[in-house]
A protein has these predicted regions:
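Conserved post-catalytic alpha-helical subdomain immediately downstream of the catalytic base
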Residues: 294, 313-379, 383-385
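Conserved phosphate/ATP/ADP-binding segment of small-molecule kinases
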Residues: 211-306
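Positively charged, low-complexity intrinsically disordered leader regions
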Residues: 22-55
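Conserved N-terminal subdomain of the carbohydrate kinase-like
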Residues: 83-175, 372-385
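Hydrophobic beta-strand scaffold residues
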Residues: 84, 110, 202-204, 237
Length: 385
């Protein structure tokens, strides 16, 4: 059958408009294709975990490979079956070998700057010490980041054009990496600029680690560094009332302490000032967590997407290991956005994956995408036969 040329042009224009509308969801132009769906920039670490035993009495530890930025890439690869990469430092000694093996096992493509260990004092892959706590006893976290290789990373260390040569859809970094040194924040900005040139969406996790920032300037320095990074971000995550945006981009309000940790109005009040200051930001999302005890949390999430606020359901969590729950939320939320879910459903996927992640030992996921979708739809803990 002959189709008139004018009709062909009209059909072509309609298809192009449909593609444009699909790509322009959330106020963002998310690339539909790329060799890498997601690339994160950050430090790789190993976490020593004695479980419920405090370190002063511990006789054995599990070893978890982690990194706030890496965890998102690992979760997206392992649970959500996406093509991801991590840009980081690696050291040629047994701890580096252990970490590199776990990165490969999670299905994440590595882009490393290699450092040579001198056999005595480094450079090193950082060690995080974190017990799980129990009941009324809170978890305790401390670090050995002496002569850390990742803290020595600087602009010019990576060939971004090569890393992004096959196309990249999403680039991510975070406040933990920004806190390591003067040059890591500069490298984040360099990576963000290169990612934007490659057409990628850029996100930043506002996670705030007071112990890390106190080494070189404290809260005032954190404000300066994170504010400089935020102006390049399309998406911000991690602004819960425990830290994040509340300490990273604004002066804490006394009203925060007067309201429930699950009250989304706290989030909404902060959003107005942030998006006015950073009009480049189109999406902001965070978990809402009320800690009743180490093992019992109330869990929710909230997102602001292109001018509209969305709130997740709330559930009660029995916590096995809380480390990585926020990264679990972020990665599930990113997955929803990358796959074109509507904002409410993307938020539920993040909420569900973050909740499930707290039921596993370690910092990265053991969930399947089917489990996440089932829980997001209101699934229960009934046995599946």
């Amino acid at each position: 059958m002959h189709v008139p040329f004018c009709l062909k042009r009209a059909m072509s224009a309609l298809n192009n408009m449909r593609r444009f509308i699909e790509i322009m969801k959330y106020g963002l132009s998310i690339p539909k294709k790329g060799a890498l769906d997601f690339v994160s920039l950050g430090a790789l670490v190993h976490r020593l975990d004695p479980g419920v035993i405090p370190f002063r009495k511990a006789t054995e530890c599990a070893i978890h490979v982690s990194g706030g930025e890496f965890n998102c890439a690992a979760n997206l690869a392992d649970c959500f079956r996406m093509q991801t990469g991590v840009v980081s430092a690696m050291v040629d000694y047994p701890i580096g070998d252990l970490i590199a093996e776990r990165v490969r096992a999670m299905g994440v493509r590595p882009f490393y700057k290699m450092f040579k260990h001198n056999g005595v004092n480094g450079p090193n892959m950082a060690t995080v010490y974190s017990d799980c706590g129990q009941g009324v006893r809170a978890p305790v976290v401390f670090y050995n980041r002496s002569n850390e290789a990742a803290a020595q990373l600087k602009p010019g260390d990576f060939d971004w054009k090569t890393i992004f040569s096959g196309g990249v859809r999403w680039f991510h970094s975070g406040g933990i990496f920004a806190a390591l040194s003067e040059t890591t924040g500069q490298l984040i900005i360099e990576g963000m600029k290169a990612a934007k040139e490659a057409g990628a969406i850029v996100s930043f996790d506002l996670n705030y680690r007071e112990k890390l920032w106190n080494i070189w300037g404290g809260h005032k320095r954190a404000l300066s560094v994170i504010a400089g990074i935020a102006k390049y971000a399309d998406v911000l995550v991690g602004m819960g009332t425990e830290g994040g945006l509340q300490k990273g981009l604004s002066t804490p309000s006394p009203e925060v302490d007067k309201k429930s940790k699950l009250d989304p109005s706290v989030f909404s009040a902060m959003i107005d000032s942030i998006v006015n200051k950073y009009p480049n930001v189109k999406i902001v999302a965070t978990t809402l967590r009320d800690v009743h005890s180490t093992n019992h949390h109330s869990w929710g999430a909230v997102a602001w997407v292109d001018g509209k606020t969305y709130v997740s359901p709330t559930c009660e969590l029995t916590i096995l290991d809380r480390v990585g729950g926020g990264d679990g939320f972020a990665s599930g939320f990113f997955y929803g956005l990358l796959t074109g879910e509507n904002p409410a459903d993307a938020l539920k996927l993040g909420w569900a994956h973050g909740a499930l992640l707290t039921t596993f030992p370690g910092d990265t996921t053991m969930a399947t995408v089917e489990q996440v979708r089932e829980f997001a739809k209101g699934g229960s803990a009934r046995i599946q036969r």
